[in-house]
């Protein structure tokens, strides 16, 4: 695009260098300090890059957005505020492109990110609900095997939830003298 921000052009050039990509894949210790010192990449530049990938997604440029989000995820720390959003974005890009294998990988990455993040129970529940929603697209397009995996995704926490509900119901019945059916 001719109207890409300068930061986006610089990062696109950075990510197009095969030696840089190879180094990033082999060295998991690359962080923003390293990128700033050795390549002049700052957090602000990455933020512009992330926002521009969202712009490309909103314009229907899913392949470009997916590529940009993949690059962004390769340098951003998993605990950063935008990491989960970038995972969701790449998942959405791959779903609308019907890339079911990659979508499944991203679905699991999102699930793992939800589980390890320190967020409120309500936010975690909301994220899991969205995970199930997007999971429908991924699993229903994988045939019978996908339906089985979807059922597992829905039931994975079900036994814990069922136990919790029964425990609360039992205590409530004793406290309020109610008979459980």
Q: Where would I find each of the regions flagged by the language model?
A:
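Extended alpha-helical scaffold regions
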Residues: 1-181
């Amino acid at each position: 695009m001719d109207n890409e921000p300068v930061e986006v052009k610089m990062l696109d050039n950075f990510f197009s260098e095969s030696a840089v990509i190879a180094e990033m894949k082999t060295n998991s210790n690359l962080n923003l300090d390293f990128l700033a010192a050795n390549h002049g990449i700052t957090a602000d530049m990455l933020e512009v890059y992330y926002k521009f990938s969202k712009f490309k997604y909103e314009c229907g440029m899913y392949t470009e957005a997916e590529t940009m989000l993949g690059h962004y995820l390769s340098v951003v720390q998993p605990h950063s505020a935008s990491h989960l959003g970038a995972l969701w974005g790449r998942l959405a890009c791959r779903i609308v492109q019907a890339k079911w294998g990659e979508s499944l990988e991203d679905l699991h990455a999102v699930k793992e990110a939800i589980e390890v993040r320190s967020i409120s129970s309500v936010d975690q529940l909301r994220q899991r609900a969205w995970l199930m929603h997007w999971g429908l697209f991924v699993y229903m397009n994988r045939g019978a095997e996908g339906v089985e995996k979807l059922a597992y995704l829905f039931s994975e926490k079900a036994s814990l939830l069922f136990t919790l509900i029964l425990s609360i119901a039992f205590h409530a019945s004793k406290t309020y003298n109610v008979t459980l059916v």
